[in-house]
Design a protein with these regions (language model features):
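A short amphipathic helical element positioned immediately N-terminal to and/or at the very start
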Residues: 2-10, 86
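Membrane-helix entry/capping segments
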Residues: 11-12, 238
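Membrane-proximal extracellular/periplasmic loop immediately following the first transmembrane helix
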Residues: 37-123
Length: 238
């Protein structure tokens, strides 16, 4: 019986070869699908680095002459002062934990700002979080030293920026990485003595752009820069 079975297999070796080839192709395709699904789910379930539970977004624009409450002659300084008044009133409500201003950098935002600075001669490029200090408390960012979001809010100043700890990891030629960045004073935009310089005042855990962005992707590396009144005024004029 075994001899007849082996003989039959040998006689049908050509058709069996095609069958094995088909099975191999199906196996490769299934393996690829499983691998893609596994990697996608693994990335999806990684820590986001922020928390949006019970957060709300308010968007403001300047009134045009077509608005019923439009007041001609108002200056940008007055509009920015009114914006701060809205923020202060919201922040003093007992059911509100924190309120911040930001420009084009809330979680899951469709757009983003870019930023660059130099570590010695190495240009480092990342996303830009253009924010006021309370932003860290609103979205509960985490300081790498374990001190929480309050310390990050205190660290962000017009002369001091806050970075994600992994911001320079993809730049192998950079002289400093990770915790070594803390306290460095670096030129931004241009590597020249007269360029604006900012201090690296604090580092946060990696913050992902969305659920499908890995922690080492461009969208998960950022620099948080103080959103000044002057910047708000210039944004309102554009």
């Amino acid at each position: 019986m075994n001899r007849n079975l082996l003989k039959q297999i040998w006689n049908e070796r050509r058709s069996n070869a095609f069958l094995w080839m088909e099975l191999f192709v199906v196996f490769v395709i299934l393996w690829y699908i499983v691998d893609v699904v596994y990697v996608t789910l693994s990335i999806y379930n990684l820590p986001m680095g922020f928390d949006i539970e019970n957060t709300y977004v308010l968007r403001f624009e300047r009134m045009t002459s077509k608005a019923a409450a439009y007041q001609p002659g108002r200056t940008m300084k007055e509009d920015v002062a009114d914006l701060h008044e809205i923020v202060n009133r919201l922040a003093h409500r007992p059911d509100v934990e924190a309120v911040s201003l930001s420009q084009n950098c809330i979680p899951y935002n469709d757009g983003a700002n870019s930023f660059s600075f130099y570590l010695d001669t190495v240009p480092v490029r990342s996303l830009k979080r253009w924010i006021t200090p309370e932003y860290f408390n609103v979205f509960r960012y985490r300081n790498i030293d374990g001190s929480g979001s309050e310390s990050l809010a205190e660290a962000l100043t017009p002369s001091g920026m806050v970075l994600s700890v992994n911001i320079a990891d993809v730049y192998q030629d950079a002289p400093w990485h990770g915790k070594e960045l803390l306290g460095r004073r670096v030129p931004v935009w241009r590597n020249e003595p007269e360029a604006e310089h900012l201090s690296i005042a604090a580092l946060t855990e990696p913050v992902r752009y969305d659920h499908f962005t890995a922690p080492d992707d461009y969208g998960s590396r950022y620099a948080a820069v103080y959103l000044t009144d002057e910047a708000l005024e210039s944004l309102g004029e554009t």
